[in-house]
Amino acid sequence: FSKGFGLAGLRAGYIITTQDLIRYISKVSNPFMMSELSREMAAAALSDRTYGDSHSGDFIAMKEALRAACGDNLTMACTDDRVPICLLQHRDERLDLQEELMKHGVLCCSGTEFEPMERNSVRLRVPRAEEMGKLLAAIEAVGIAP
């Protein structure tokens, strides 16, 4: 849900159960409790049934371009191309991939934030179309560099 609608970080779900069980569930501290704003965002995203289909072609094309730009030293994990995030890993385990991409102005999340990945990996969002050229140039530069 969150990634497919471009709302990464928003966790939304629901439970269908009995009133008795709801009484117990409501007593549990839930780290994923949604604020009113989050509920409104989730409802708005779910009400637009065309969003995913209308943008999936864009995401597919951009992820294909990213994959083609990776060069010999970068690999892109296999994920559904309709999802606007990807995982990149550099062959050199000593390389801080986030730092290298930041030198080119690309914001991403270091693999060290996700077990068991290391600093030679990053997770990044597919950018808006107008920013894609900058990302591709950075990927090519880092993918070719030893």
Which sequence ranges carry the predicted segments?
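Residue-level detector of anion-binding/catalytic polar loops
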Residues: 107
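Hydrophobic side chains in well-ordered alpha-helices
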Residues: 25, 97-100, 135-138
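Conserved PLP-binding catalytic core of the aspartate aminotransferase-like
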Residues: 60, 73-104, 122, 126-128
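Alpha-helical scaffold elements within enzyme catalytic domains, especially in hydrolases
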Residues: 58, 69, 100, 138-141
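PLP-dependent enzyme catalytic core of the Aspartate aminotransferase-like
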Residues: 103-104, 115-146
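Short, acidic/turn-prone active-site loops that include or flank metal/cofactor-
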Residues: 2, 112-115
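PLP-dependent aminotransferase class I/II
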Residues: 1-72, 76-78
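A short beta-turn/loop motif at secondary-structure boundaries
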Residues: 78-80, 114-117
